[in-house]
């Protein structure tokens, strides 16, 4: 059966389940897997037994860290699910899974409504234009309010929800939903066994008026989307279920609106209709249509690939994972063509050939071997050596480079020191594997102390990376205190600065002269460096120009104030001179490096620090303490609002002031407040703080 469904892309859905950390996303995914026949024993996140949370740390913490790809079937349709994490430190996982999805189910907590992380994940989905349906979960929870949650979708996300179901009862009395498309009640009364089929009933009398009101809104929206339907609607004719579903599907696929359903995944209520909605309203690979890329070595030449088996093979690697038996697993989304195990393909991003060993479709951490990979699907490949996240794989005779992914730089670092020599060796392996898997994990060697310094997106992110080193790679190490990843930049333009590198050591010497201009710069795509060659008339031979650029980029690794990386600058090479015998690539590299350092000192260098967007939710009575505390941490209050009877304070606060914040917040609010924090931007450090940072870095 599986093979038959595979080839008809109308029956394939590549979706993600996206949500805030506690909205019940993993439980929802578990239920989907159970109802689609993959799981026989249901895993609860509370027990640490969930299928998609398959790394040990995830089981312990009850949060989803790695997006595991899972394939399942529903009513003769195939659904490939990417489980995305809901914790803010793992936004890279969310970004990379959204890049390869066709649609998503956004899960909201029926009591809390749209929460901070939901807003962020929603914005990421909008960036990749991913159509979504909304599932208001936890309707059995004390204080659950479906209508409030729908309103938060409008107010906090600025989105247009289309209500397709109304809840029957709430909290302990939540018994089912009113289906507004077919105007019937779908109920699961009492304690529901897992997998139990719902009962179809008449709409309860006390909901008849509300159902009629929301049905009317639904029909108006549907009629407005299509001229024929509008004529029919205004002529008083009944719209068929097929017509209504077709119109909703069209608007959903175009991201004009977002269908809203509700239920309680934990209590097994509302899961089947949500699966039906995935099939009815979310796009298949054919709806998404052709994918764009560019020719190898020429970004201006746009190429396209259709989601067809007949097209040349193209795929995007979106995740690397370590497998206990197979080693490196590369998860790919195939956009066009087909490929067999054992075939050779081109990694167009790196310009290298790769051979595919085996092909699998995954079910969390179980693997199902397949005979071919075809367009429109998600697979795990074994045997790829050089491929990393964001790389394009393609047919050797039809190269294409698909749009890659951009990942933020780490904002927090810790030093890590192996306890023994054998730990030192194991650390090398661990770091290499983890860096392959996670593009936001950075590693550098502190040349002064000889320590290895690792960087990540937050304290939890680094905790988990260190934890994995201990568990998976058996590395025992001492971990230093978290350090902030500062940057340096320039604030003024230096019109002209020249530097001559001259060295005479018997025989041939070294000679290179460069004249440069330096100015502040931020590229449209967020690039933080640009090199422009303005040399004319062969004053510097063409083969030496890249060496000047390379030397400048080397110098940018260590800034001029406190040794932090230099960012956001443009270097223009204006002129220079060379010597027939003494000039070399090395000489021009040194000249480029020294010229940049000297010019940067004259360009008003400053230190930048990461600012975090902090959102604190607190009971009213602690509001003053919370704001006072944020102000004392150099925070800038951005907004205050009321949410679910609590107060929410939004502020931008330097990361350096946020270490240990959770403990302080708990003691100030008797444990009743909570907060979320996500990287926002880099900003200039005040002069007094800058002096402290420089003194600490230079030991003065």
Swiss-Prot record:
MF terms in GO: GTP binding; GTPase activity; translation elongation factor activity
Pfam families tied to this protein: EFG_C, EFG_III, EFG_IV, GTP_EFTU, GTP_EFTU_D2
GO biological process: ribosome disassembly
Binding site for GTP: 19-26, 83-87, 137-140
PROSITE patterns in the cross-refs: G_TR_1 (PS00301), G_TR_2 (PS51722)
Gene3D superfamilies per the UniProt record, alphabetical: 3.30.230.10, 3.30.70.240, Elongation Factor G (Translational Gtpase), domain 3, P-loop containing nucleotide triphosphate hydrolases, Translation factors
Residue ranges occupied by any tr-type G domain in the UniProt entry: 10-286
SUPFAM superfamilies the UniProt entry points to: EF-G C-terminal domain-like, P-loop containing nucleoside triphosphate hydrolases, Ribosomal protein S5 domain 2-like, Translation proteins
TM segment ranges: none
UniProt keyword list: Cytoplasm, Elongation factor, GTP-binding, Nucleotide-binding, Protein biosynthesis
Subcellular location: Cytoplasm
HAMAP family the UniProt entry points to: EF_G_EF_2_B (MF_00054_B)
Function of the molecule: Catalyzes the GTP-dependent ribosomal translocation step during translation elongation. During this step, the ribosome changes from the pre-translocational (PRE) to the post-translocational (POST) state as the newly formed A-site-bound peptidyl-tRNA and P-site-bound deacylated tRNA move to the P and E sites, respectively. Catalyzes the coordinated movement of the two tRNA molecules, the mRNA and conformational changes in the ribosome.
Family: Belongs to the TRAFAC class translation factor GTPase superfamily. Classic translation factor GTPase family. EF-G/EF-2 subfamily.
Name the UniProt record assigns to this protein: Elongation factor G
Organism from which the protein derives: Rhodococcus opacus (strain B4)
High-level lineage: Bacteria, Bacillati, Actinomycetota, Actinomycetes, Mycobacteriales
